[in-house]
Each structure stands twice: as structure tokens, then as C-alpha cells.
């Protein structure tokens, strides 16, 4: 969520979403070159900082000096928030969907546990063997949703692991995709799982929910 002069992936944007009734906030995480966690969608530096840089190559001190830009690429007063600051601000308020964090899951979970917020976290990732092993190792009790692209090739495997498998994000190009068929939806429903369709349209060339 963002609005007016408020950039996305900021505490100000999260507050807007909560005021509008949001139950879950999605955020992107990265680690600075010296190991501190921040909330920002890496790769979006030109749009959100008006700088052609790779923010993860900067120190935490340097990142704290940066200011986010609004939709017109005008600099705001808002900083790139640390993950610790975001956790403390949102404690007890809503569910936090941590995106782009599987490769830094160990420090991410250390921060979550430090703030005592395990029950507020939702982890998502691709269902690769490597990602699932990381979830099992560092976040076995955390609500987890794999991201299935067109078809589900991993549920049987996940069910045999020590993972709190509560549902899945499904991405499908056409209404004929296996993950959107009634038989599959009913099977997951009977197992008490939530299926989450991604209706965001980043590009008309890459439909995430059949259009």
C-alpha cells in the first residue's frame, strides 16, 4: 500500500493499510552489506530512491541516510525502515507476510523471535527443495505458504516435512491451469488450507491470475 506522498514498504504505508482495514501486510526484506535487515524491494531503487544503485551493497549507516521517493520521484522525509523498527511498530497489530526473505531466513527469524512475534508471521517462498529445507530448519512453526506456478508439484513433499503448511499462493496464466481447477481447490479446502490468488497486475504481458 502507498498513497499520495507515502512510498510503499514504509511504516507510513503500513499505517495507511491498517487504517483501511488490512489484516495482513506484505513487505520485502534485504540485508545490508554489514548484516542489518531492512524493508525495501531490491531492484526498485530507481523507482523508490531515484538512484541507480544496489542498496544491499551499502552499510546500514549509509542506508539510514537515504530517503524514499514518492510516485513522482520526489524525495520524501521517509527513511528506509529497518526490520527491527517495523517489527516493533507492528507488534500485536496484524499478520506480516515476509516476501523475498527465504535466502536470509536465519537472521530474519532471529529478529522475529527477539521481538516475540512468531504468531504474527507468514512466510512464503518457492517450493524448491532448498527453500523448503530452509523453512523446516529455521521456521518450522511459522505459518507457511508455498507459491505454486500453474501447478502444485510439492504438496505431497511438504506434508511429509516439519513445516506448518497452512495454504498456498497460486499463480496462473489461464483459467485452465491445474491450480485453479475445482477438484484441486476442493482438495485443498478439505485439508483446511487457504488458497491465495495474486490479483496484482505488474505487467499485461505477465498475468498472475488469468488476466
Q: What residue spans do the PLM features occupy?
A:
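Phosphate-group recognition and catalysis centered on beta-loop-alpha active-site segments
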Residues: 1-211
